[in-house]
């Protein structure tokens, strides 16, 4: 039996960093949003563990969240099963788009089905939380208000948004960005509540005005290109532009599709990754 799953990326429409926890993580408040950029993963029963990927820089050990999810399930349920996994990578690495977390979420769903585990929703959420902070969101997808370290999720009614994603030639360590935040003395902008109110009204201009990311302040200080991309997107007609996650990907929100397409063509030769995307209401899709 073979299973193919689309694992969708996410953007942070807001990200408030509230405090550092005793366990080393940070308390956050964030509106997380699934987008239609996706990796595709094939899973097949096997006697041994085989992992293939069409991107040579994807790690194959425990630092790969697919393998972390695989081992978490095997260890939790004392299993000795093998698996063959093929990953077709479309979400850029270390980009703030939760590509690794989305792949891990797909792995949890796939192993549940292939190994007939009949996991409850609560069990899946526990495994997801153990694997990574963004994995619980990627398991559910859509539009969510995330709190705790990102694993506590509350449903929100989303709004269709047209986005242009731009990733400069950088790969940024999430851990390093949070360390820089801790050392910066910055306080959270606390933008999430205003954003949620705008979302409830369905007012696109107010939504765009309240898109914000605390971590952008430390990342853009170190990497000027973040501000350059934001400025360029605004000049080309975006209602707003913001970094997602710990970066370095920046997205612009457009309400004029012609301007969006023009901006895509203008920027695609300038930066290594530029993609048109839109918001969706799911994190995973079985093909």
From Swiss-Prot:
BP-aspect Gene Ontology terms: isopentenyl diphosphate biosynthetic process, methylerythritol 4-phosphate pathway; terpenoid biosynthetic process
Pathway-wise, it operates in:
Isoprenoid biosynthesis; isopentenyl diphosphate biosynthesis via DXP pathway; isopentenyl diphosphate from 1-deoxy-D-xylulose 5-phosphate: step 3/6
EC number(s)? Answer: 2.7.1.148
Q: Answer yes or no on keyword Nucleotide-binding.
A: yes
**Catalytic residues of the enzyme:** 10, 134
Q: Which GO terms describe its molecular function?
A: 4-(cytidine 5'-diphospho)-2-C-methyl-D-erythritol kinase activity; ATP binding
Task: Name the catalysed reactions.
Answer: 4-CDP-2-C-methyl-D-erythritol + ATP = 4-CDP-2-C-methyl-D-erythritol 2-phosphate + ADP + H(+)
Give the EC class as a word: transferase
Q: Which InterPro entries match?
A: GHMP_kinase_C_dom, GHMP_kinase_C_sf, GHMP_kinase_N_dom, IspE, Ribosomal_Su5_D2-typ_SF, Ribsml_uS5_D2-typ_fold_subgr
Q: Which UniProt keywords apply?
A: ATP-binding, Isoprene biosynthesis, Kinase, Nucleotide-binding, Transferase
Residues engaged in binding ATP: 92-102
UniProt KW Kinase keyword: yes
> What does this protein do, in the record's words?
Catalyzes the phosphorylation of the position 2 hydroxy group of 4-diphosphocytidyl-2C-methyl-D-erythritol.
Family statement: Belongs to the GHMP kinase family. IspE subfamily.
Q: What is this protein called?
A: 4-diphosphocytidyl-2-C-methyl-D-erythritol kinase
């Amino acid at each position: 039996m073979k299973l193919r799953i689309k694992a969708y990326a996410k953007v942070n429409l807001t990200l408030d960093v509230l405090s550092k926890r005793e366990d080393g993580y940070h308390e956050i408040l964030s509106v997380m949003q699934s987008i239609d950029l996706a990796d595709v993963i094939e899973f097949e029963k096997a006697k041994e563990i085989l992992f293939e990927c069409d991107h040579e820089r994807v790690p194959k050990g425990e630092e790969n969240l697919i393998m972390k999810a695989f081992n978490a399930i095997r260890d939790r349920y004392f299993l000795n099963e093998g698996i063959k996994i093929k990953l077709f990578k479309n979400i850029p690495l270390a980009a703030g788009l939760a590509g690794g977390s989305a792949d891990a979420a797909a792995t949890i769903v796939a192993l549940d089905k292939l190994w007939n585990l009949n996991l409850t929703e609560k069990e899946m959420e526990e495994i997801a939380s153990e694997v990574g902070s963004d994995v619980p969101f990627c398991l559910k997808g859509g539009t969510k208000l995330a709190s705790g370290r990102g694993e506590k999720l509350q449903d929100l009614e989303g709004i269709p948004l047209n986005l242009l994603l731009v990733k400069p030639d950088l790969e940024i360590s999430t851990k390093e960005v949070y360390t820089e935040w801790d050392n910066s003395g910055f306080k959270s902008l606390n933008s999430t509540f205003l954003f949620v109110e705008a979302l409830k009204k369905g007012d696109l201009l107010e939504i765009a005005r309240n898109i914000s990311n605390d971590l952008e302040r430390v990342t853009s200080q170190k990497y000027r290109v973040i501000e350059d991309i934001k400025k360029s997107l605004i000049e080309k007609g975006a209602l707003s532009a913001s970094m997602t996650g710990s970066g370095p990907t920046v997205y612009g929100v457009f309400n004029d599709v012609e301007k969006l397409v023009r901006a895509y063509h203008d920027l695609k030769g300038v930066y290594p990754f530029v993609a048109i995307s839109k918001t969706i209401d799911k994190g995973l899709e079985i093909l």
